[in-house]
Design a protein with these regions (language model features):
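Charged, helix-rich terminal subdomains or tails
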Residues: 1-173
């Protein structure tokens, strides 16, 4: 017999009743257990009929979450994007608005027009060629454009960006 561990992680408003938080994380845990082999994590989106139709709950096996989401996508973003609390002259500036816009374009990736919008957004981020952040920009442009075109990598990148956004959100947001 193999022991498996499934988890549901939800982020709620501080005024949300504990019973509602428990219900929501229970639904997330059930979503994680629906993965083949269980042993998974589901986070953020609460699966329900009332939820936004285009939003999907992030659900991964632990290995994929640790290696692909955190180990690759999140680590890459932390290294090359400069956001609140993670600024450096050699990082590409990406404020909260840019991160949200990026996340929305990744979420709406149904056709070529959105790929063009994503490429345009990346192009608008280009710093001057003599900027210390230019090398970071080149790496970000190449990686994010490639990840956008792969469904699994795009979902992993969305989760990594959500983790960053939740980290930099201010109280009350």
């Amino acid at each position: 017999n193999k022991l498996s561990f499934s988890a549901g992680i939800g982020i709620f408003d501080s005024k949300c009743p504990i019973s509602e938080m428990a219900r929501g994380t229970g639904l997330l845990e059930s979503t994680a257990k629906d993965n083949p082999g269980k042993d998974s994590i589901a986070m953020f989106g609460i699966p329900s009929a009332e939820s936004h139709a285009s939003y999907t709950t992030a659900s991964y096996g632990w290995e994929e979450f640790v290696q692909q989401v955190c180990g690759e996508k999140l680590t890459f973003c932390q290294r090359y994007l400069g956001y609140a609390g993670n600024e450096a002259v050699d990082r590409l500036p990406a404020g909260k608005g840019v991160l949200y816009r990026m996340l929305n374009l990744l979420n709406e990736s149904r056709d070529n027009i959105n790929l063009a919008r994503f490429a345009y957004m990346l192009g608008r981020m280009e710093p001057p060629k003599d900027s210390p952040a230019y090398d970071s920009y080149a790496k970000v442009r190449e990686k994010l454009y490639g990840w956008y075109q792969d469904k699994a990598a795009r979902k992993q990148l969305m989760t990594a960006l959500e983790l960053i956004i939740y980290r930099i959100r201010e109280k009350g947001e």
